[in-house]
Curated annotation (Swiss-Prot):
The family this protein is said to belong to: Belongs to the SfsA family.
Protein name (record): Sugar fermentation stimulation protein homolog
Signal peptide: none
InterPro entries: SfsA, SfsA_C, SfsA_N
Source species, domain of life: Bacteria
Molecular functions (GO terms): DNA binding
Amino acid sequence: MRFPTPLIEGRLVRRYKRFLADVRLPDGTMVTAHCANPGAMLGLNTDGFRVLLSPSTNPLRKLGYSWELVEAELPGGPQWVGINTARPNALVAEAFRENKLAPLIGYETLRPEVAYGKASRVDFLASGGGRPPCHVEVKNCHLMRHAGLAEFPDCKAARSARHMEELAGVVTAGGRAMLIVVIQMRAGAFDVARDIDPVFDRALRMALEVGVEAYAYTCAVGPEGVAIDTPVPILTPGATVQPARTSG
């Protein structure tokens, strides 16, 4: 996914009220950008980090910029990280169209925001191609506390735990369901940050035990755009989840 307009570079001054970030542009101008990320952003919101903003062309929008990327000092070295949690669903849809998601190859359509469970909407419902419908839940990942290991979540994620329970319900009822973790950076493996949220850890493991599938993909991230790139293994006790090779 290429950014439609060139991103604007700046230096992070502070992130506050979760969804706001003050950024100093190269000419010294201070702007406030929308931070589309409700998480803790551990290791990513350090003052002085280089950031990239996408400008808005909507004259009615209150904030003229959205924070897209940060060049973070992570274990193993600096790298660009995507922090916009609105991007992963679009990245999955793009990868589906390009036949890059091996577990979903053969399906004809990927319909977004379909009602299911008690009171939820699944991110996607894959259907067609003579295959059983598949409920797909997408999670964004940008936490790295150990070199090469991406983790989720970076804060308590009660809603995500509920999603795992509802995916498990789909499989228990005879359907197919999967979790796709979109890692907006380079990594060699994925694991649950169980010390941060043991409830989500238990919910995911229980879902895997009943047959919910789980896949994790890193992304190629840079000033020009973000794209799903490489499958990586998931290190989850009680389940063996192999990386799903991309195709095409």
